[in-house]
């Protein structure tokens, strides 16, 4: 594919404005055919010359992108270093979580104003938009995870980073109780005091009370989830290959991959899985390729409701061409080891129960509040009306609790539960916390001067400081929606972009989006290390196929 210089420059400019979303957006390829959504190209075999030319183009493009991404990452790293103001009184701030909201907050906090402590059950930040790519080996998990200690080197004292789970919060005494999650400190508890608390623990998987989902299904929210899916895929393929005496029914069941949830996460996994079947199973398990298939189940009337109608139609047509079956208006009622029990709404409005055999179930049907969040919602009187998360105001202050803030999926703000929202919330909160930190430092200086100089001389000395305090104002949060992206398979994607000079969303679809997506997410990857490793993974997949060793 050749792209004009002007168009490439346009794509680069757009990549700086498009964010990422948490369960929402992952990889995608975008075409300039904005309105011709029904014209879906059919996958085709490429000649050796075409593939060689494509490889050369990809190599040169990725080399250029790698240099740009490396420069940008080093620049961000330099800008995030501590300012090191000496002698300024600091408040102790505890941040719970290591996801989008927590990381954005810490990255933007001024370490000269706060002593920062981080508590998280995991020791890394996960770039969730690319997680579906790890389920089939397009990318490797280490490429999209960043160690917390390395990420905040020079900003947080390593002794203040705790791989632990917060089990209780005493909002009156301003203390959190944590329990270790590593082998070395598993089960051990500690208590950490705070002046300010940032609650950013995210959300859990919504199962609607169906126990069989947790017993037999796979989720797609954490790094370990992707590894579990990856291993399960190969277990199924090897089991069917080895056991020649399987009945036709059992063989068909094992080779049926089912996905529940028609949002971006579910759609993107289905797309990645079909790519794996079309491009890699044919080489590793050629006798199984024609039989393994993917079905996506969605309770609502349609998939991807956050996108424009033309993009939804494009995706549905593409999935049909790729042999991915979509079942809408289908509610999962129960899950056992081998079957899904669903209720299907027919075109005439009647309902019918159906049993769907499956070999692997990937559950991507939404999120729900974590137990600690639910405990807070039930124990704080001002949170009595909370359902999806803690009720916060426009400054992210938790209603009913002083000096406690909440951002991301654990907070209810009326906005979608996406990485884009959490990232903006975390950065905005940090900006306001820096204002609060400056006010605190100025008040401390004023009190010290008044104590040192006495009541007669102090007013003239502290007048300027008090004026500075008056000028420091908090700003209510303003969300800037920048678009939605989703990979839909066969090196194609969809995107609704919000551009500052346009009132309506700009819908994009198809192959050009692959370049756009890579530019956008390379720019958003949190470190030069991750950018380099992702580039290598893409190149490796292009040249040698997907990663196929279960390690």
UniProtKB/Swiss-Prot annotation:
Its EC number is 1.6.5.9. It catalyses: a quinone + NADH + H(+) = a quinol + NAD(+); a ubiquinone + NADH + H(+) = a ubiquinol + NAD(+). Pfam families: NDH2_C, Pyr_redox_2. GO terms for cellular component: mitochondrial matrix; mitochondrion. The keyword Repeat does not apply. FAD binds at residues 92-122. Keywords: FAD, Flavoprotein, Mitochondrion, NAD, Oxidoreductase, Transit peptide, Ubiquinone. It comes from the Eukaryota. Its main location: mitochondrion. Disulfide bonds: none annotated. SUPFAM superfamilies: FAD/NAD(P)-binding domain. NAD(+) binds at residues 255-291. Belongs to the NADH dehydrogenase family. This is Probable NADH-ubiquinone oxidoreductase C947.15c, mitochondrial. It comes from Schizosaccharomyces pombe (strain 972 / ATCC 24843) (Fission yeast).
